[in-house]
Amino acid sequence: MKIIVSEEIESVCPTFVGACVEANVVNTPYCQELWDEINALGEKYKQTLNTESLKEMSGIAATRKVYRACGKDPSRYRPASEALIRRMLQGKELYQRDTLVDLVNLASIAYGYSIGGFDADKFEGDTLTLGVGKANEPYEGIGRGMINIEGLPVYRDKTGGVGTPTSDNERTKMSIDTTHLVVLINGYDGDEQHVRENAEYIIQLLKKYCQSDGGSYFIYK
């Protein structure tokens, strides 16, 4: 897997650093131990954060700043990490999907980065390019139908968009049958050490909950 960061992104976020985790996995419908971790973190955040202070988490604040620089309102199109933590703080249940989706959500909540999880066998070609969404660019968000990604950072494969910090694409989404996983961590705050820690955390979660050796990761800028 090769990942290119376009000049469009470099111009609005010259310090961007990303990580790509790739692993062979076994997905399951539900994992109680994983949800125990998710719920424990939710309780911790309820003691330490509110819906305003969470916007100051480094990864979230930087992603919101990039949205504005690209012309997108981050209060209307919230980064997924912010939306997930906000839901927890409001006392709402997180949506339970399957172990891979739930695991990626936990990794995003724990570090504040918007993280995309993909079935790598559904990508077209072997290269992803991170750019900015165009006017009228077709994009079907998972469970959201067609969404307007103009001004959103977007990863594209040979066919089109596969992931934004707000919503990943139906075409390349993880499913219960996914065995070849790619996870992309978006460090718009430029904190390479924190991004690496997030990648290593994901590898540990995959070992614990997805019958995986954890795979490997690389940094891209």
List where the protein language model places each region.
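Charge-biased, low-complexity intrinsically disordered regions
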Residues: 1-221
